[in-house]
Curated annotation (Swiss-Prot):
Name of this chain's protein: ATP synthase subunit a
HAMAP family: ATP_synth_a_bact
Protein task: Key component of the proton channel; it plays a direct role in the translocation of protons across the membrane.
Family annotation (PROSITE patterns): ATPASE_A
Family: Belongs to the ATPase A chain family.
Pfam families given in the database record: ATP-synt_A (PF00119)
Transmembrane as UniProt keyword: yes
Matching SUPFAM superfamilies: F1F0 ATP synthase subunit A
Subcellular location: Cell inner membrane
Organism per entry: Oleidesulfovibrio alaskensis (strain ATCC BAA-1058 / DSM 17464 / G20)
Length: 233
């Protein structure tokens, strides 16, 4: 927490998992703890919902089908029909990041995505996954397209392409981390300046912002996968 800001009472500290000792050194562990909480919640909800899916959907099931189906059509509109094969990974990205973002609005919790290690891990997985899909689909042709359309351009194109692709996980991780961490600080400042009731409108604004950040990550991952699924020019 920044100097001068009050330290909130966190669940991770109450259960003794805010920090752990590794080799005699105190290491911050709270964001791993909250990530586990989100994973446990998602697994529990998935298990419960799975048993309640009906052929004739109710209102809640209809809402989820519209959201999930709408996001799938969004992916297909960008990547083509091949996007349906990678959609399960993309929707897990969206839901996982969304839940981690929203965790920061729950009293006693901190958003795991407010830690650079969490966002860097997500971005690195995305980077490895879309390159794996490209190599799996096109083989050596995927690597070849980094060198440009003509062989004599390869000394120029190869470094540029490598820098461009390497910058992707960096930008993904820093964008998500910076926005979520900044919102956490702003929320603390509002709590200092206004009563709890006065901060309720800010909660709605931050909820929208956290949904938007999850969607931006989802959209960029979709665009990167589009490049992997397309034929290397």
């Amino acid at each position: 927490m920044a100097s001068g800001l009050p330290h909130p009472v966190l669940l991770s500290d109450l259960v003794g998992l805010g920090h752990i000792n590794v080799g005699g050194q105190s290491v911050e562990f709270k964001h791993v703890f909250y990530t586990w909480c989100v994973m446990a919640m998602l697994f529990a909800v998935s298990f419960i919902v799975r048993g309640k899916i009906k052929m004739v959907p109710g209102k809640l099931q209809n809402i989820f089908e519209v959201i999930i189906g709408g996001l799938e059509e969004f992916v297909v509109s960008i990547t083509g029909e091949d996007g349906r094969k990678v959609y399960p990974v993309l929707i897990v990205f969206f839901l996982f990041i969304l839940c981690m973002n929203l965790t920061g609005l729950v009293p006693g919790f901190d958003a795991p995505t407010a830690n650079i290690n969490t966002t860097a891990s997500l971005a690195l997985f995305c980077f490895i996954y879309y390159n794996y899909i490209g190599i799996q689909r096109w083989g050596a042709g995927y690597i070849k397209h980094f060198m440009g359309p003509m062989w004599w351009l390869s000394p120029l194109m190869l470094p540029l392409e490598l820098i461009s692709h390497t910058a992707r996980p960096l930008s993904l991780s820093l964008r998500l981390f910076g926005n979520i961490r900044g919102e956490e600080f702003v929320l603390i400042l509002f709590f200092m300046l206004a009563p709890i009731i006065g901060t309720i409108p800010i909660y709605f604004l931050f909820t929208l912002a956290k949904v938007l950040q999850a969607f931006i990550f989802f959209m960029l991952a979709t665009i990167y996968l589009k490049g992997s699924l397309e034929h290397a020019h």
